C-alpha cells in the first residue's frame, strides 16, 4: 500500500477480469456513481479495427478540458492515458476516488472515439447546477419532432451517446458539446426506437474494461464494482447500455417504446452567469460550429419580465450577449469546407424562467469566495488523510530536467503519479477558482512602497540565511550545553519559522497556482514537529539530574560557561562576538539601587553567561538556489562530544537517558535544517520567478502617507471622510468605493505604486480601476481570503456592546472655532496655572491618600472637560490649504498664469504655519499623555514599582533583521575598534542611568507641576497657531476676491463644510427681507401683485376662468413664486388675471436655463392658441373668450415683443425660429394690439439678423423696459468744476516734459482712473454676466470679453501700484509713493470708484509691500489709519458686509462698483443651489433664477448714471502706458527681498500687526528659549515641509 498514490487503474487487467467474468453483479456505495458497459465497449477502445457498430453509452458527467493533457501523444507515454487538448469536451464514464477519471472524447470530423484516464483537475465542469437539474425524474409524454427541448436534458435523461466500435487513435480535430450532441441526435434518429434499451429492461453481463476494477487488479481503493450484460438489438447488432445507479429520489423509468422528451416546465429556475465567465467558457472551447443564443423571458423577484439569452449547446444563461471572436470567419480552412451550424438550434424551450432562490446574478468575487471555502474544506480533509501516514514516509522531489515547465506540462511529463502531491479536490477547486476569480498577488516588501528599517529583511534568501544561522547557532549552543544562549537562539528560530509560514500564507495564491501547497504543508509539519521535539527534549535534558550533576562537577575548561558580566566575549578562535552589542541591548542588565530596594530583585534579572559564536559561521552557509542539491546539508555537528560524558559511568541510568535525549535533540536539529533547506528549495524552484522578494511581513508605513490612530493628517494621500477616502461626493455602493474626505473632492488620490500593490493583492488591475474604486473592491474581494486590505478581519465579527462609530464633525476654520478654543484654554489656565491654579494648590498639601485622590479626580475632570480642544485640533477643516496644494500640483484650466504664481507664493508662506500647527498638535498629544502619567505617579511611593513589568527585550526584538555580520561595516578593518567603543559607550550610559544607579530620586510632585505648566502653555499656543491659520485663510480669500478671481475662490472653497457665502445656499431663507430689499425693485409691483392675487381668490371665479396649472406652482411665505413646472411657469408668464412684472423680467432674463429658444417660442404660440374646455355653454364660451382667451393672446404678443426688443441676443438663435413669422402674420390678421410691432421685430431680429451689424454693447441697456431712459440725462452729484481741472497752461506744461507719477495731483489721478474704469464698466452687458454664471451649460452666450477687460485692468492696476513701490531702491521714495497711493485710494472712495480703490488697497497689502518694515516706518500714522479703514471696508468677512452696506447707500449717483462681489454672487448662487426643487426633475427652482436675475439687474443698474468728468488725454496716456508689461507678484517679491532683505527676527510690519500676531511672536520666543531645552522650536521660520509638497 506504500505506492497507492503513484499508480493508475490497470485497464488491461480490467479487460481480462471482464472477459473472465460472466456473472452479473452490482455493488455501489452511497457516494459513488457506478456505470455499466458491455464487452463491446472494451472492444471499441482497443486498437484493432472492427465493423462500425453503434454502442450506446450514458456518461455520468461532462467536462471541458482546462489544459492540454498527454498531447501530443509521446512514444513512451502510457496507452491508458487520454490525450486531450484544451477546450475539448470529455464524457466521463467513471470517477475513481484517487482523482483519476475514465473519459472519452469524440472527433467532430469522423466521429471516432478516444478513451483513457485523465486527472480530474484537468477538467472544468460546464455548469455546477445542470447535472443536478437533469437528474430530476421526467414526466412521460409524447412529443413530435417540433418539440422544443434542451439538448442537455435529452442527454441527462434518455439520450445515450452512440459511438462507433472502431475508434481510431489518431489525432482529432476540436470537439464541442454541440457537435457531440448533434452526432448523438443523428444516430438516434436513424436507428429508431430499438436503438436504446432502457435501464430497467437491460440485463448486466460482461464487465467494463476500464470501470470494473478490483483491489487485486489495481492499486486504487475503488468503492464500486461493476457488471455488465450483452443485449442484442432488433437488427442483430450488439449494443452496450451504460447507466448510473440513481439515488432513491432520482430514478428514471422509461420503456423502450417511448420517445425521450423534455419535461413540462412552466417555471424553470435558472442561474444567470456574468458576462466575463460566459466569454471565458466560450473562448476556451474551440470549434468551427457557430454558437446560437436564444432570447428567453425571465421572471424576476419583483414579478417583472425581462429577456435573458440562452445557449442550448452549453445550457447557460446570461443577461446580455457576449462579445466573442468569430471562429468560423477566422478559421484557416474556411475555403476548404463550408461553416457548420447547429441543425437543431430552434429546439429551445421558450417557457419563462425564474431566478433560483437566493441566487441573483453573482459576480466573480462571490463565486471566488465560495470556491475558496470549498477548497479550504477539501484541503482540511486531505490533511486528515495525510496525518494517518507514518512519519517514515519521507517526501522527495524529483529533480527533472524539465522542472521549469509550467503546471500542466509537469503533469504530462511526470505522469499521474505526480498528481498525488496535491489533493485532487484541492486542485479541482483551485482551477475553478482561477477560472472565475481574478489572480491575486501579495504586497511585496519593496523599498519604493514602504518605509523600511535599514536592517529589515526583504528577500526570501535573507530570511533563509537568518533561519539557518539561528539554527546552527542554537545547535552549537546546545552542544556546548549553554542553556541561556540556546534558549535565546531557539526562540529566534521559532520567530523565523513563524515569519516564514506567514510569508507562505501571504503568497498562498502563487503557491496554489504552482500546485505546491500540499508539499509545503508537509514540510511545515515536519518543521513544527522538529521544533516541538527539540523544545521538549532540550528542556528534559537541561532539567535532568545528570546535567545538573555534570554542571556541578565540571571543571573550568569550558570558557563558554564561565563568562559572567564581562564587557567583551570571545569565541573559540578569540574573535569578538558578532552580535555582542545587540545582545547587550536585548538582554536585561542587572541593577541595584541604594534607596528603593523594594523592587531591586524584580527590576531586572542578573545577566547570565554569554556564549560566543564564530562570525565565520554565517559565511559558511551557502544560499540555496533552485539548482542546489537538497542533500548537501552542512551542520555544525560532527559527533557527540564523548569528552563531555567520559567522566560519568555509562552504566548510570541517568547517563543513558540523558544521552538518548541528547542524541534525539541532535538528530532533530539535522532534520530541522534539512526541512528548512527543502522548503526554500521548493519555493525557489517552483514558486518564485525572477524576484524572490518577501511579502511585507512587518507593519511599516506606506511611503507618501502618514495618518493613523488618534493622529489625522488631512494632507495624507488617501484620507477618506467616513472611511478615509477621497472622491467627488459620490455615494458608497457595494461595487465601488468612494474616497472623499469630508465630501472633499480635492484631496489627492492614492499613490500609484501603493494603489497597484493593494489592487494586485485584491485581484484587480489598478490600471483599469480608478483610485476611488479600489478600497471597497479590495475589501469585498478579499473578505474570504487571508489577505484583507487595511488589516480588516476576514470574517464577520459580532460584538454585543459594539458602538456605531459616528462621523466626526469638522470644525470650520473660523473665528467661532477660535473663540471656543480660547474659552477652553482659559479654563485650563484657571485650573492649572502655576500661580493661581486650583489644582496645583492641592499638590502643596502633605502626602496622603486623600490628597492623591483629589489630584487624580481633579486632573481627570479637567482633561475630560477640555478634550474638545484636542478634538478641534484633530478635526479642524483645512480644506482650503489642501485645495491650495492640489491646485499647485494639478493646476486647473480655469486659472491664469498669475493665479498659479500666486498659489505657489502663498503655499511657501503658509507651509511654515501649517508645520507649526502639526508640531503643536503633536505636542498637545504628548502633554496630555504625560499629564495623565504624572498624575498617576503621584499615588506611588516608589516610581519604579512597575518597571519589572517591562519586557526583557526591546520593541521589535522578535522581528527578523539582517545579521550585521554580513554588512561591510563588520567586515571592515575598523570593526573591532568600533565594537569596543560602542561597548564602552553603552556601559557609560548605563552607569549614568538614574533608574539603575539612583543618582537622583524622582520627585513625583515636581514632575506633575512641570506637566501642568506645559499643558497650560501648549493649550494657549495652540490657540495662537489656529489664529494664524485663520488669518492665512482670510488672506487667500481676500486676494482671490479682490483680484476678482471667482474661479480661484470656488476652487479654494471646494469641499468646505462651512460655506463662505451662506446666503447663496438654498437653505438660506427666502424670507430674509434684508437681503431682498437690496435686490428687488419696488417698481416691479410685487406688493400690488400679491394684493390683486388675493382679491382674485376672493371673487370666486368660474371654473373655466381659473388657471390650469396653478397647483403646479410653489410659493414662498411672501407669495413669490419659488418653483414650478415649465407649463405652469409659461402660464404664469402670460396670465390672464394680472401681470407679475418682477416674474416676467426674471423669466425673460433666465428663460434659457429652463427652455431652449425654440421651445420658448413654441410654448408661447401654444399658449396663444389655447382651446376652450369642453362642456361650455354659449354664454360661458363668450365669457371665456372675453376674459381669458383674448387677454392671454395680448399677453403672448407683448411678451414676444418685449423679449425681442430688450432681451434678445444673437446667441439665442436656433434653426426653425424664423417660422414664427407665419404666426406673427396671423396675429396681425387677428388685429391683436402690438401685433404689427411684433412682426417688425421678428423681421429685424430673426429674418434679417445676419445682415445687420452687431449693436455696440456700450449703447445697449438690458433693463430699459423697467428703467426710464430719461434718467441717463440726470447729472451726477459727483462732478468736477472747470476750476478744479488742470488749466491749459498746466496741460501744456505736462506735454513739455515727461510726466512723473508724483507730479500728478492725487485727486486728478483718481478722477482719470475713475473715467477709465467707468468707460470699461459701461461696456458690460447682461449676457456677459449670464455667461459668467452659466458658462456654456445651457448655450454659448458669446463669452464675456468686456468683463475680462474690466477685471484685467483692475488687476493690472494692483500690480502696477506694488511694482512702482517695490522697484524703488530708496526707502524714502518708497514711503512717499505709499502715502501717495493711499491718498489716491481715498479719493477713489469719495468718487464712488470702489473698483480702483480696492485695487490700490490690495496692492498695499500684498506680501511684497506688506513686508517692507523700513518703508512703513516712514509712512505717517494718518496714512496708516486711513489705509486700515479702507482695508476694513473691503474685508471679505461675512461676504463683504461693510462694503455692501455702503454700496446700498449709494443711490442715484454715478458709481463704479467692485465687480468681484458680483462675480462671487453669480458663481456661488449658481453652484450652491439645485436646478430643481424637492429632488424632482420637473419642478424648476425658480428662486435660483430670481437671485441670478436680481444680481444681473443690480450690475446693469449702475450703467444708468454717468460721471461728468473731463478726460485728460495726457494723464490717460501715462496711465495706459504704465499698465503695460507689469510683472506678477512672484517677481515683485524677489524685488522686495532685494530692497529689504529678510531679517531673522522680523516677521512682518508693525503698523498692521494684530494683537494675536504680537502674542504669537512672544510665545514663540519664549518656547525657543525654554529653560529645559528647545521644547518647541516654533519661533524660526521653517522651510516648506515635505508634508505639503
From Swiss-Prot:
The modification Phosphothreonine is found at residue 635. SMART domains: RasGEF, RasGEFN, SH3. PROSITE patterns: RASGEF (PS00720), RASGEF_CAT (PS50009), RASGEF_NTER (PS50212), SH3 (PS50002). Residues 1117-1247 form the N-terminal Ras-GEF domain. One of its GO terms (molecular function) is guanyl-nucleotide exchange factor activity. InterPro entries: Ras-like_GEF (IPR008937), Ras-like_Gua-exchang_fac_N (IPR000651), Ras_G-nucl-exch_fac_CS (IPR019804), Ras_GEF_dom_sf (IPR023578), RASGEF_cat_dom (IPR001895), RASGEF_cat_dom_sf (IPR036964), SH3-like_dom_sf (IPR036028), SH3_domain (IPR001452). PANTHER family: CELL DIVISION CONTROL PROTEIN 25 (PTHR23113:SF368), GUANINE NUCLEOTIDE EXCHANGE FACTOR (PTHR23113). This is Cell division control protein 25.
Amino acid at each position: 500500500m506504500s505506492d497507492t498514490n503513484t499508480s493508475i487503474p490497470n485497464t488491461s487487467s480490467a479487460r481480462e477480469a471482464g472477459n473472465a467474468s460472466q456473472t452479473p453483479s452490482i455493488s455501489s456505495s452511497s457516494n459513488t456513481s457506478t456505470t455499466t458497459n458491455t464487452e463491446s465497449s472494451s472492444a471499441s477502445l482497443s486498437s484493432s479495427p472492427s465493423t462500425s457498430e453503434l454502442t450506446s453509452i450514458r456518461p455520468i458527467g461532462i467536462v471541458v478540458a482546462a489544459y492540454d493533457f498527454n498531447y501530443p501523444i509521446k512514444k513512451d507515454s502510457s496507452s491508458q492515458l487520454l490525450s486531450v487538448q484544451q477546450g475539448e469536451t470529455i464524457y466521463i464514464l467513471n470517477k475513481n476516488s484517487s482523482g483519476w477519471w475514465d473519459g472519452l472524447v469524440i472527433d467532430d470530423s469522423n466521429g471516432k472515439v478516444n478513451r483513457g484516464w485523465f486527472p480530474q483537475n484537468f477538467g472544468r465542469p460546464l455548469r455546477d447546477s445542470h447535472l443536478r437539474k437533469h437528474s430530476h425524474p421526467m414526466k412521460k409524454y409524447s412529443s413530435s419532432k417540433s418539440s422544443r427541448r434542451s439538448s442537455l436534458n435529452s442527454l441527462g435523461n434518455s439520450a445515450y451517446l452512440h459511438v462507433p466500435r472502431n475508434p481510431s487513435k489518431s489525432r482529432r480535430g476540436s470537439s464541442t458539446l454541440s457537435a457531440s450532441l448533434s452526432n448523438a441526435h443523428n444516430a438516434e434518429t436513424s436507428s429508431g426506437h430499438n436503438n436504446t434499451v432502457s435501464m430497467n429492461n437491460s440485463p448486466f453481463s460482461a464487465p467494463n474494461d476500464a470501470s470494473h476494477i478490483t483491489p487485486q487488479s489495481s492499486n486504487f481503493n475503488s468503492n464500486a464494482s461493476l457488471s455488465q450484460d450483452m443485449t442484442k438489438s432488433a437488427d442483430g447488432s450488439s449494443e452496450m447500455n451504460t447507466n448510473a445507479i440513481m439515488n432513491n429520489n432520482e430514478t428514471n423509468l422509461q420503456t423502450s417504446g417511448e420517445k425521450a422528451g423534455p419535461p413540462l416546465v412552466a417555471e424553470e429556475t435558472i442561474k444567470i452567469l456574468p458576462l466575463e465567465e460566459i466569454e471565458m467558457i466560450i473562448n476556451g472551447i474551440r470549434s468551427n460550429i457557430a454558437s446560437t443564443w436564444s432570447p428567453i423571458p425571465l421572471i424576476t423577484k419583483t414579478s417583472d419580465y425581462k429577456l435573458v439569452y440562452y445557449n442550448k449547446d452549453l445550457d447557460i444563461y446570461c443577461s446580455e450577449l457576449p462579445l466573442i471572436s468569430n471562429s468560423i470567419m477566422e478559421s484557416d480552412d474556411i475555403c476548404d469546407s463550408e461553416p457548420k451550424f447547429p441543425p437543431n438550434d430552434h429546439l429551445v424551450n421558450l417557457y419563462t424562467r425564474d431566478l433560483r432562490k437566493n441566487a441573483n446574478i453573482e459576480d466573480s468575487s462571490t463565486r471566488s469566495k465560495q470556491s475558496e471555502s470549498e477548497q479550504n474544506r477539501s484541503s482540511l480533509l486531505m490533511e486528515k488523510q495525510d496525518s494517518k501516514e507514518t512519519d517514515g514516509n519521507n517526501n522527495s522531489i524529483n529533480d527533472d530536467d524539465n522542472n521549469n515547465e509550467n503546471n500542466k506540462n509537469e503533469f504530462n511529463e511526470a505522469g499521474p503519479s505526480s498528481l498525488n502531491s496535491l489533493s485532487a479536490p484541492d486542485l479541482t477547486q483551485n482551477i475553478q477558482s482561477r477560472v472565475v476569480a481574478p489572480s491575486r498577488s501579495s504586497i511585496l516588501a519593496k523599498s519604493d512602497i514602504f518605509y523600511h528599517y535599514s536592517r529589515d529583511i526583504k528577500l526570501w534568501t535573507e530570511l533563509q540565511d537568518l533561519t539557518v544561522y539561528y539554527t546552527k547557532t542554537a545547535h552549537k549552543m546546545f552542544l556546548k550545553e549553554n542553556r541561556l544562549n540556546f534558549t535565546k537562539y531557539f526562540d529566534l528560530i521559532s520567530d523565523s519559522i513563524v515569519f516564514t509560514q506567514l510569508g507562505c500564507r501571504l503568497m498562498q495564491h502563487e503557491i496554489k497556482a504552482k500546485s505546491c501547497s500540499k508539499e509545503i504543508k508537509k514540510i511545515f509539519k515536519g518543521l513544527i514537529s522538529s521544533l516541538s521535539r527539540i523544545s521538549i527534549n532540550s528542556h528534559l535534558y537541561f532539567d535532568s539530574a545528570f546535567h545538573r550533576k555534570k554542571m556541578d562537577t565540571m571543571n573550568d575548561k569550558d570558557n563558554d560557561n564561565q563568562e559572567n558580566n564581562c564587557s567583551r566575549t570571545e569565541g573559540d578562535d578569540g574573535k569578538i562576538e558578532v552580535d555582542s552589542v545587540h545582545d547587550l541591548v536585548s538582554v536585561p542588565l542587572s541593577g541595584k539601587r541604594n534607596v528603593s530596594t523594594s523592587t531591586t530583585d524584580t527590576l531586572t534579572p542578573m545577566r547570565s553567561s554569554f556564549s560566543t559564536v564564530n562570525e565565520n559561521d554565517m559565511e559558511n552557509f551557502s544560499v540555496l538556489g533552485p539548482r542546489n542539491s537538497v542533500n548537501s546539508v552542512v551542520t555544525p555537528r560532527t559527533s557527540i562530544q564523548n569528552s563531555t560524558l567520559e567522566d560519568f559511568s555509562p552504566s548510570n541510568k541517568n547517563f543513558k537517558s540523558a544521552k538518548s535525549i541528547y542524541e534525539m535533540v541532535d538528530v532533530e536539529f539535522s532534520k530541522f535544517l534539512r526541512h528548512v533547506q527543502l522548503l526554500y528549495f521548493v519555493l525557489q524552484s517552483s514558486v518564485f520567478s525572477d524576484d524572490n522578494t518577501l511579502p511585507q511581513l512587518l507593519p511599516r508605513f506606506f511611503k507618501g502617507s502618514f495618518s493613523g490612530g488618534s493622529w489625522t493628517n488631512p494632507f495624507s494621500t488617501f484620507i477618506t471622510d467616513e472611511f478615509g477616502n477621497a472622491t467627488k461626493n459620490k455615494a458608497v455602493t457595494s461595487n465601488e468605493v468612494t474616497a472623499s474626505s469630508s465630501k472633499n473632492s480635492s484631496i489627492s488620490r492614492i499613490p500609484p505604486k501603493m494603489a497597484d500593490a493593494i489592487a494586485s493583492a485584491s485581484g484587480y488591475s489598478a490600471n483599469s480601476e480608478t483610485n476611488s474604486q479600489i478600497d471597497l473592491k479590495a475589501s469585498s474581494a478579499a473578505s474570504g481570503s487571508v489577505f484583507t486590505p487595511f488589516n480588516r478581519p476576514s470574517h464577520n465579527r459580532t460584538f454585543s456592546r459594539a458602538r456605531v462609530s459616528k462621523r466626526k464633525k469638522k470644525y470650520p476654520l473660523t473665528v467661532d472655532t477660535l473663540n471656543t478654543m480660547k474659552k477652553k484654554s482659559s479654563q485650563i489656565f484657571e485650573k492649572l496655572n502655576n500661580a493661581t491654579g486650583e489644582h496645583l494648590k492641592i499638590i502643596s498639601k502633605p502626602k496622603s491618600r486623600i490628597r492623591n485622590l483629589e489630584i487624580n479626580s481633579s486632573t481627570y475632570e479637567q482633561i475630560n472637560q477640555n478634550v474638545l480642544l484636542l478634538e478641534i485640533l484633530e478635526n479642524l477643516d483645512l480644506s482650503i490649504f489642501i485645495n491650495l496644494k492640489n491646485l499647485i500640483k494639478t493646476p486647473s484650466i480655469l486659472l491664469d498664469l498669475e493665479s498659479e504664481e500666486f498659489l505657489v507664493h502663498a503655499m511657501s508662506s503658509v507651509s511654515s504655519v501649517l508645520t507649526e500647527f502639526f508640531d503643536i498638535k503633536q505636542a498637545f498629544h504628548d502633554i496630555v499623555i504625560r499629564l495623565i502619567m504624572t498624575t498617576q505617579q503621584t499615588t506611588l511611593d516608589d516610581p519604579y514599582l512597575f518597571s519589572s513589568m517591562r519586557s526583557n527585550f526591546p520593541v521589535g526584538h522578535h522581528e527578523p533583521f539582517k545579521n550585521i555580520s554580513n554588512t561591510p561595516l563588520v567586515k571592515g578593518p575598523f570593526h573591532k575598534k568600533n565594537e569596543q567603543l560602542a561597548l564602552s559607550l553603552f556601559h557609560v550610559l548605563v552607569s549614568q542611568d538614574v533608574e539603575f544607579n539612583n543618582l537622583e530620586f524622582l520627585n513625583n510632585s515636581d514632575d506633575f507641576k512641570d506637566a501642568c505648566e506645559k499643558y497650560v502653555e501648549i493649550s494657549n499656543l495652540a490657540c495662537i497657531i489656529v489664529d494664524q491659520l485663520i488669518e492665512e485663510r482670510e488672506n487667500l480669500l481676500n486676494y482671490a476676491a479682490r483680484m476678482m478671481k471667482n474661479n480661484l475662490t470656488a476652487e479654494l472653497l471646494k469641499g468646505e463644510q462651512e460655506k463662505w457665502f451662506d446666503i447663496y445656499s438654498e437653505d438660506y431663507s427666502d424670507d430674509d427681507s434684508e437681503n431682498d430689499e437690496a435686490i428687488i425693485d419696488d417698481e416691479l409691483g410685487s406688493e400690488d401683485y400679491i394684493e390683486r392675487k388675493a382679491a382674485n381668490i376672493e371673487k370666486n371665479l368660474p371654473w373655466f376662468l381659473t388657471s390650469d396649472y396653478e397647483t403646479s406652482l410653489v410659493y414662498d411665505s411672501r407669495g413669490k413664486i419659488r418653483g414650478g413646472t415649465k407649463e405652469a411657469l409659461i402660464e404664469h408668464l402670460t396670465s390672464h388675471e394680472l401681470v407679475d412684472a418682477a416674474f416676467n423680467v426674471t423669466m425673460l432674463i433666465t428663460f434659457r436655463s429652463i427652455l431652449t429658444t425654440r421651445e420658448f417660442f413654441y410654448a408661447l404660440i401654444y399658449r396663444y392658441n389655447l382651446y376652450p374646455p369642453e362642456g361650455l355653454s354659449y354664454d360661458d364660451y363668450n365669457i371665456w373668450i372675453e376674459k381669458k382667451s383674448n387677454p392671454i393672446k395680448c399677453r403672448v404678443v407683448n411678451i414676444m415683443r418685449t423679449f425681442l426688443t430688450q432681451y434678445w441676443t444673437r446667441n439665442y438663435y436656433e434653426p426653425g425660429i424664423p417660422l414664427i413669422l407665419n404666426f406673427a402674420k396671423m396675429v396681425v390678421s387677428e388685429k391683436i394690439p402690438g401685433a404689427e410691432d411684433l412682426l417688425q421685430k421678428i423681421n429685424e431680429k430673426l429674418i434679417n439678423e445676419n445682415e445687420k451689424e452687431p449693436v455696440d454693447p456700450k449703447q445697449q441697456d438690458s433693463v430699459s423696459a423697467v428703467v426710464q431712459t430719461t434718467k441717463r440725462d440726470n447729472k451726477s452729484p459727483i462732478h468736477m468744476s472747470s476750476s478744479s481741472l488742470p488749466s491749459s497752461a498746466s496741460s501744456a506744461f505736462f506735454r513739455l516734459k515727461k510726466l512723473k507719477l508724483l507730479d500728478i495731483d492725487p485727486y486728478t489721478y483718481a478722477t482719470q482712473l475713475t473715467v477709465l474704469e467707468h468707460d470699461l464698466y459701461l461696456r458690460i452687458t447682461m449676457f456677459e454676466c449670464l455667461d459668467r454664471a452659466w458658462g456654456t451649460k445651457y448655450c454659448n452666450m458669446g463669452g464675456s470679453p468686456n468683463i475680462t477687460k474690466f477685471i484685467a485692468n483692475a488687476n493690472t492696476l494692483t500690480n502696477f501700484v506694488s511694482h512702482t513701490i517695490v522697484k524703488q531702491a530708496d526707502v524714502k521714495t518708497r514711503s512717499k509713493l505709499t502715502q501717495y497711493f493711499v491718498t489716491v485710494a481715498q479719493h477713489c472712495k469719495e468718487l464712488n470708484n470702489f473698483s480702483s480703490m480696492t485695487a490700490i488697497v490690495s496692492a498695499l497689502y500684498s506680501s511684497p509691500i506688506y513686508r517692507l518694515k523700513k518703508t512703513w516706518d516712514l509712512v505717517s500714522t494718518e496714512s496708516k489709519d486711513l489705509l486700515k479703514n479702507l482695508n476694513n471696508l473691503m474685508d471679505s468677512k461675512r461676504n463683504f458686509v461693510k462694503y455692501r452696506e455702503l454700496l446700498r447707500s449709494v443711490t442715484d449717483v454715478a458709481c463704479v462698483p467692485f465687480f468681484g462681489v458680483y462675480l462671487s454672487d453669480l458663481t456661488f448662487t449658481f453652484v450652491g443651489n439645485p436646478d430643481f426643487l424637492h429632488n424632482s426633475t420637473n419642478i424648476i427652482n425658480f428662486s435660483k433664477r430670481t437671485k441670478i436675475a436680481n444680481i444681473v439687474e443690480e450690475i446693469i443698474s449702475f450703467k444708468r448714471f454717468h460721471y461728468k468728468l473731463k478726460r485728460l488725454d495726457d494723464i490717460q496716456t501715462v496711465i495706459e502706458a504704465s499698465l503695460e508689461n507689469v510683472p506678477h507678484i512672484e517677481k515683485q517679491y524677489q524685488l522686495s527681498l532685494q530692497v529689504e532683505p529678510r531679517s531673522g527676527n522680523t516677521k512682518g510690519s508693525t503698523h498692521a500687526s494684530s494683537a494675536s500676531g504680537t502674542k504669537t511672536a512672544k510665545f514663540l520666543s519664549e518656547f525657543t528659549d525654554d529653560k529645559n531645552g528647545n521644547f518647541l522650536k516654533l519661533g524660526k521660520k521653517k522651510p516648506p515641509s515635505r508634508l505639503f509638497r
